[in-house]
């Protein structure tokens, strides 16, 4: 019993000694941290002296920006106040070390320590056709009398909000900016016209469904843009607009026909345009001088459709840039190129004569004056399904005067074709002006050394007399693809 009490006494004594040492250390540390300076020579350091918000939609709150206020000095500093120069009328919202508002006071930044500032903004409508700049200053007033400032700036644009809109009568959208939440639908029997120069911003998971007819007529100088609504950056070098999956995509349903898209740019969605199986004899869609690029799924999927695609770019998809499942399709002067690197991907072009195991006769698939390229050794795949019960399901295709990344084959359906030979070092990148997989920047104008130059036939000149940029094509020896080669002039 006595022995146990002695052990308990010794243990308690050790605990008391340890507590005394820790208390002394804490008191010493607190005493050192509590030494504040009122000298104007001691300054704060900001991780950024200007906080810039990318172009924002008015009345819609911005993402939150964060910056750090550091005290690298040997003594602590007191901040008498932090305030927005615009006061309570400022559109900017500030949170400083847990305090929220346009005016905050009695803040401390200990020596060798830091605090965080969170900033956001919600801009009022400005009734301007161009982005309107808004600026304010966040003032830090130190106990010493020293003033330091961080600039806050943003640019706001007005948009027309469309939330779950269903177009039931013939409608023309005037040129402008539209922000789509949930969906934009066109009912059967109705036609939606979209004026040149229009931009449709789609929120996350928002989509467009056409049961009637879509008539989107842009121009070279005023294209129609379909894109996501994120205008900020993931990283300093990477806008969200270059990242696939920002919105859902466009569905042309089975009841829809006579759709026309000219000079449209559709990008960075889960899929581009999906044309569902419809009435066999209907002209389902004409795509001309347009760009579909950067998708999680397929850029263009055609199921038992009569479709014509002219002078267009279809690029960079985790699925296929073009997937054709039966029907009658013609591609003239198109660039179909896949350099998608976000995940393991499929080939640029795939042809099928079945849909979910059922026959889907491929009556005709013509690719004339086209480029089919990418980083794989073979970017063209055909799936000619053999059906039971002696079902003869058509699988007809033809490639003419085109530049194709596929092995040289003894096939009479390949006429005047030049075969690409991607090397192991550059993987087909040298065919185009810019293929930058580091910052996900792509320019599919053909390079001077690209073997697609002079490959095209003049037979289709009346179909595509100008390239997608509006440059006239020569009557003979034009280039394959949607871009005719133009020498870059050095300034």
Where are these regions (language model features)?
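Positively charged n-region of N-terminal signal peptides that target proteins for export
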Residues: 2-7, 12-15
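Short, solvent-exposed loop/linker segments at beta-strand-coil boundaries, enriched for Pro/Gly
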Residues: 85-103
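Sec-dependent signal peptide hydrophobic core
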Residues: 16-23
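Beta-strand/loop edge motif enriched in small/polar residues
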Residues: 31-36, 44-55, 60-62, 103-442, ...
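C-terminal motif of bacterial Sec signal peptides marking the signal peptidase cleavage site
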Residues: 26-29
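Asparagine-centered strand-capping/turn motif at beta-strand->loop junctions
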Residues: 69-73
